[in-house]
């Protein structure tokens, strides 16, 4: 029996099917997930990420990230220490932060795998276009809760599930590395489960506050 990767309940039901994969929705937390048999191997997953060409010199990409970064900067105190979780091969958030005198460390499973960074505590953690790639979001969110200081902020950017009709035409689901998809209901469930306060920043950006 398949269990939800976020809440571990077995209330999964078919949500969508295409030529590549099937997609299941949890009746408890609302997450839409791809069964493990469709997940890429680590080598194939990294090969997909190796194609990314995002750099700090790409003004379009900086503008894209600024929809998370600028609201975050407005909410943190001077001297705050942050972590960019899943920064990718060309970290940009930390570069943008440094330009404003903010210290951000880079962590990525494939490109900046520095486990010691996950043993420190932070005033904020950013995950921009990351959480949809994570096979075990329950464990990850609990880990991030443990490294966030009290009143710390978790900033997440990921496109949100609206409904089945929109999902069926959604380009976002076609990326083979995207395996978990979040709706507003899902983020509300996460907030209740971890006692985090949820703030909706944009159509694809949410902030959680550890209280």
Predicted regions and their residues:
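Short "lid" loop at the C-terminus of a central beta-strand within the Rossmann-like core
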Residues: 159-164, 180
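Conserved beta-strand signature within the Rossmann-like core of class I S-adenosyl-L-methionine
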Residues: 151-159
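A short SAM/SAH-binding and catalytic strip from SAM-dependent methyltransferases
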Residues: 126-136
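Residue-level detector of anion-binding/catalytic polar loops
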Residues: 103, 153, 197
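A short, conserved alpha-helix within the catalytic core of class I
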Residues: 134-144, 158
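Short conserved AdoMet
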Residues: 77, 135, 149
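Conserved N-terminal segment of class I S-adenosyl-L-methionine
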Residues: 1-124, 128, 141, 157, ...
């Amino acid at each position: 029996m398949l269990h939800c990767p976020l809440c571990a309940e077995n209330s999964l039901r078919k949500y969508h099917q295409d030529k590549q994969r099937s997609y299941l929705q949890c009746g408890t937390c609302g997450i839409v997930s791809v069964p493990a048999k469709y997940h890429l191997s680590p080598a194939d997953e990294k090969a997909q990420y190796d194609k990314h060409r995002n750099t700090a010199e790409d003004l379009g990409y900086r503008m894209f990230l600024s929809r998370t970064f600028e609201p975050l900067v407005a909410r943190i105190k001077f001297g705050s220490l942050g972590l960019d979780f899943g920064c990718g091969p060309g970290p940009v958030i930390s570069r943008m932060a440094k330009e404003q005198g903010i210290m951000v460390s880079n962590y990525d499973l494939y490109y900046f795998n520095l486990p010691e960074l996950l043993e420190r505590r932070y005033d904020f953690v950013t995950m921009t276009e990351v959480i949809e790639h994570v096979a075990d979001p329950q464990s990850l969110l609990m880990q991030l809760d443990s490294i966030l200081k009290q009143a710390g902020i978790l900033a997440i950017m990921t496109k949100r599930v609206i409904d089945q009709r929109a999902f069926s035409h959604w380009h976002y689901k076609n990326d083979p590395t995207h395996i978990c998809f979040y709706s507003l209901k899902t983020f509300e469930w996460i907030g209740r489960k971890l006692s985090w306060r949820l703030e909706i920043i944009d159509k694809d950006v949410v902030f959680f506050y550890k209280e």
